[in-house]
């Protein structure tokens, strides 16, 4: 049986609609009928066929890793799931036998394989993944929200890496993950949550999500905002989401002594920073990759169930046959999360 899929078919700019064989689940796998998928920044890198993509993505391959769907089949060894379960899933498939996996730190597996990056992805009518990677979506959480659990998980992992209760938090980079991280920090009890960017559309989205201040650093100095808020010692927690050297250096400059930074944005490999600030301020910098399995996933569901409203971050939905419009919208920078509906 042939099914529809979006794939990287050629080593050039673009994503293409194609048909592929319907996948068959192995002994420990789930077969998921995809309802909705979301376009990730990684998918845009793949679309643009940048240097990272050229060195990483096998061609041809079905891409995509943000999704929600319904279990329609499973392998004979699977336990804990039933046909009809609504699921999303962890996009990092881990080996299970390295030291970190065996110690319960699976998000630090050195042999991680990415769904839609190193193996067949979720931009298709059906997806097969290991049952271990699937997460049941609680009733009351919409398909739209469930489809963005992967990037929401990056935001939660970053925002909750350090204690933010009563603290002042700076987020550099108002992409969807940065905006969601800001909302999580505010929901979790931070005092001031300030986010910076140069994209006014996304700064407006951040304002809708309840940040204290959304600062266009092309028009306003972060130091002026700090003074207006009456802050005297800098930010306690920093979440670097942009990968922009100028943003990270600004963060270092405006951190309090003893401040803690979660680093999710991927900077150029030759980025230069003032290490004197790190040393003499006693700053802590923690690299963030993916989501903690599966602590972050349970926190995601609980945050939404406790009233965290992520609806404003989803700005556009397209039927999958209009996927090109969705990718164009994401590439324009004039969107939050863009969803492709496979049920239409």
Swiss-Prot record:
Name one matching Pfam family: ADH_zinc_N
Question: Which cofactor does this sequence's record say it needs?
Answer: Zn(2+)
Q: What is its main location?
A: cytoplasm
List the residues marked with site Important for catalytic activity for the proton relay mechanism but does not participate directly in the coordination of zinc atom: 150
Show the GO cellular component annotation of the record: cytoplasm
Q: Where does the record place the catalytic residues?
A: 42 (charge relay system), 45 (charge relay system)
**Keywords, sorted A to Z:** Cytoplasm, Metal-binding, NAD, Oxidoreductase, Zinc
Binding of Zn(2+) 1 occurs at 40, 65-66
PANTHER family per record: L-THREONINE 3-DEHYDROGENASE (PTHR43401:SF2)
**Subunit organization:** Homotetramer.
Q: Which NCBIfam families match?
A: PRK05396.1, tdh
Q: What name goes with this protein?
A: L-threonine 3-dehydrogenase
The species is Psychromonas ingrahamii (strain DSM 17664 / CCUG 51855 / 37)
The opening ranks of the lineage are: Bacteria, Pseudomonadati, Pseudomonadota, Gammaproteobacteria, Alteromonadales
Name of the coding gene? tdh
């Amino acid at each position: 049986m042939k099914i529809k899929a979006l794939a990287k078919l050629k080593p050039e700019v673009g994503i293409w609609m194609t048909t592929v064989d319907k996948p068959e689940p192995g002994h420990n796998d789930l077969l998921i009928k995809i309802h909705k998928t979301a376009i990730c920044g990684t998918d845009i890198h793949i679309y643009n066929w940048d240097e990272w993509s050229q060195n990483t993505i096998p061609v041809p391959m079905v891409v995509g890793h943000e999704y929600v769907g319904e279990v329609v089949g499973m392998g004979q060894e699977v336990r804990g799931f039933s046909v009809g379960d609504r699921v999303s899933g962890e996009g990092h498939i881990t080996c299970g036998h390295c030291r970190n996996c065996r110690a319960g730190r699976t998000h630090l597996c050195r042999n991680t394989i990415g769904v839609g990056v190193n193996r067949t992805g979720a931009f298709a009518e059906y997806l097969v993944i290991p049952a271990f990677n699937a997460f049941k979506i609680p009733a009351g959480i919409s398909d739209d929200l469930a489809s963005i659990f992967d990037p929401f998980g990056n935001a939660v992992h970053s925002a909750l890496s350090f204690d933010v209760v009563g603290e002042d938090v700076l987020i550099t980079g108002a992409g969807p993950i940065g905006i969601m991280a800001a909302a999580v920090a505010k929901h979790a009890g931070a005092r001031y949550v300030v986010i910076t960017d140069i994209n006014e559309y996304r700064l407006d989205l951040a304002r809708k999500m309840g940040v204290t201040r959304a600062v266009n650093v092309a028009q306003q100095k972060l130091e002026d905002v700090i003074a207006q808020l009456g802050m005297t010692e800098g930010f306690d927690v920093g979440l670097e989401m942009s990968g922009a050297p100028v943003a990270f250096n600004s963060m270092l400059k405006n951190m309090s002594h003893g401040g803690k930074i979660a680093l999710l944005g991927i900077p150029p490999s030759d980025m230069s920073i003032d290490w004197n600030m790190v040393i003499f301020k006693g700053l802590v910098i923690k690299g963030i990759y993916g989501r903690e399995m599966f602590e972050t996933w349970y926190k995601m569901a609980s945050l939404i169930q406790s009233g965290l409203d992520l609806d404003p971050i989803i700005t556009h939905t397209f039927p999958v046959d209009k996927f090109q419009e969705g990718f164009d919208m994401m590439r324009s920078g004039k969107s939050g999360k863009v969803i492709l509906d496979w049920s239409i």
